Amino acid sequence: MASADKGLEEIQEGQIESNYDETVDSFDTMNLKPELLRGVYAYGFERPSAIQQRAIMPVIKGHDVIAQAQSGTGKTATFSISVLQKLDPNVKQCQALILAPTRELAQQIQKVVVAIGDFMNVECHACIGGTSVRDDMKALQDGPQVVVGTPGRVHDMIQRRFLKTDSMKMFVLDEADEMLSRGFTEQIYDIFQLLPQSTQVVLLSATMPQDVLEVTTKFMRDPVRILVKKAELTLEGIKQFYIAVEKEDWKLDTLSDLYETVTITQAVIFCNTRRKVDWLTDKLTARDFTVSAMHGDMDQGQRDLIMKEFRSGSSRVLIATDLLARGIDVQQVSLVINYDLPANRENYIHRIGRGGRFGRKGVAINFVTAEDVRMMREIEQFYSTQIEEMPMNVADLI
């Protein structure tokens, strides 16, 4: 499992240096089992996030992998998809062990594995402190293919021989920095000693302090290193407005009026559902507006083509769903319209935020019905920002 990795000496400021740059930007081209791919899409994923594009393939190929990424980047699904791809559902023994620093995170990971593996006939058991030891023993004797747990309870179950390690192929450490800082180092080292020599190790961590690097040096063989830098999104420099719309049905006319008032160089309009995107595209096209639409029902080829046209400026208005907000590089977009306010406030910054280093100016206009007022207030509070009523001279601001 281990030989000292020379490359780790280059580390500065707790950041690893990537040594692997291949990316795969669609789930369809990862050669996943059909029933796993079905689970990925059923879970709501449309397109792999940055870490998923880079880390899933090396893990599936069997490399030891160190991935440095913040939470919220899609790392749970990264190792869940990889684990599910590699295990044999017909073998009723633990083939993958996932460690997490807290019970809550372990349970959350279990839910993701179960949901994505929904069509695969795979069992995943959460082995965590604070629950009945007897229940754990019983569940482990049934031979779940994936066990996710906290170091203390997992170590206990391996020592008592209820969690058998002889069929284990993969060992995943999630939030390794957290686990080590919580004093689990000894138990983690003990677990390593009890695993087969050939076990593949995958380690995920937001930071890379010395104790995490020691684990990688001791227990990982020539690891692939992937650093996903945190994209700092900011609302600075973006003027945010709302237009009060009395009822949902009036939004379309409001949008048409806005078109008349404003010369739009490029705009993205966000709706909350794919159906709404298609509906709005049809309505605007019928009113002789040129728009393109993009959502997850389209295949990757179509989406790439639409993005290319949009980036080159040959299409000026793009109507899209949230799931693509993170994938759209809207640096050149002067206007973002939230036809629907996002269903969760985190997506607001992905729709209208900009990479701070670009410092581009922009305008965001939110269509707000009476039902949306509460959500808008929540967004303002969450981001400590102000969304003001749109002034008459909005055209001068864009």
Swiss-Prot record:
<keyword id="KW-0648">Protein biosynthesis</keyword>
<feature type="domain" description="Helicase C-terminal">
    <location>
        <begin position="237"/>
        <end position="398"/>
    </location>
</feature>
<keyword id="KW-0547">Nucleotide-binding</keyword>
<keyword id="KW-0396">Initiation factor</keyword>
<feature type="short sequence motif" description="Q motif">
    <location>
        <begin position="25"/>
        <end position="53"/>
    </location>
</feature>
<comment type="function">
    <text>ATP-dependent RNA helicase which is a subunit of the eIF4F complex involved in cap recognition and is required for mRNA binding to ribosome. In the current model of translation initiation, eIF4A unwinds RNA secondary structures in the 5'-UTR of mRNAs which is necessary to allow efficient binding of the small ribosomal subunit, and subsequent scanning for the initiator codon.</text>
</comment>
<dbReference type="GO" id="GO:0005524">
    <property type="term" value="F:ATP binding"/>
</dbReference>
<dbReference type="InterPro" id="IPR014001">
    <property type="entry name" value="Helicase_ATP-bd"/>
</dbReference>
<keyword id="KW-0694">RNA-binding</keyword>
<feature type="short sequence motif" description="DEAD box">
    <location>
        <begin position="174"/>
        <end position="177"/>
    </location>
</feature>
<dbReference type="GO" id="GO:0010494">
    <property type="term" value="C:cytoplasmic stress granule"/>
</dbReference>
<dbReference type="GO" id="GO:0003724">
    <property type="term" value="F:RNA helicase activity"/>
</dbReference>
<dbReference type="InterPro" id="IPR011545">
    <property type="entry name" value="DEAD/DEAH_box_helicase_dom"/>
</dbReference>
<dbReference type="Pfam" id="PF00271">
    <property type="entry name" value="Helicase_C"/>
</dbReference>
<keyword id="KW-0067">ATP-binding</keyword>
<dbReference type="Pfam" id="PF00270">
    <property type="entry name" value="DEAD"/>
</dbReference>
<dbReference type="InterPro" id="IPR014014">
    <property type="entry name" value="RNA_helicase_DEAD_Q_motif"/>
</dbReference>
<protein>
    <recommendedName>
        <fullName>ATP-dependent RNA helicase eIF4A</fullName>
        <ecNumber>3.6.4.13</ecNumber>
    </recommendedName>
</protein>
<dbReference type="GO" id="GO:0003723">
    <property type="term" value="F:RNA binding"/>
</dbReference>
<keyword id="KW-0378">Hydrolase</keyword>
<keyword id="KW-0963">Cytoplasm</keyword>
<dbReference type="GO" id="GO:0002183">
    <property type="term" value="P:cytoplasmic translational initiation"/>
</dbReference>
<comment type="similarity">
    <text>Belongs to the DEAD box helicase family. eIF4A subfamily.</text>
</comment>
<dbReference type="InterPro" id="IPR000629">
    <property type="entry name" value="RNA-helicase_DEAD-box_CS"/>
</dbReference>
<comment type="subunit">
    <text>Component of the eIF4F complex, which composition varies with external and internal environmental conditions. It is composed of at least eIF4A, eIF4E and eIF4G.</text>
</comment>
<feature type="domain" description="Helicase ATP-binding">
    <location>
        <begin position="56"/>
        <end position="226"/>
    </location>
</feature>
<keyword id="KW-0347">Helicase</keyword>
<dbReference type="InterPro" id="IPR001650">
    <property type="entry name" value="Helicase_C-like"/>
</dbReference>
<dbReference type="InterPro" id="IPR027417">
    <property type="entry name" value="P-loop_NTPase"/>
</dbReference>
<dbReference type="InterPro" id="IPR044728">
    <property type="entry name" value="EIF4A_DEADc"/>
</dbReference>
<dbReference type="GO" id="GO:0003743">
    <property type="term" value="F:translation initiation factor activity"/>
</dbReference>
<feature type="binding site">
    <location>
        <begin position="69"/>
        <end position="76"/>
    </location>
    <ligand>
        <name>ATP</name>
    </ligand>
</feature>
<dbReference type="GO" id="GO:0016887">
    <property type="term" value="F:ATP hydrolysis activity"/>
</dbReference>
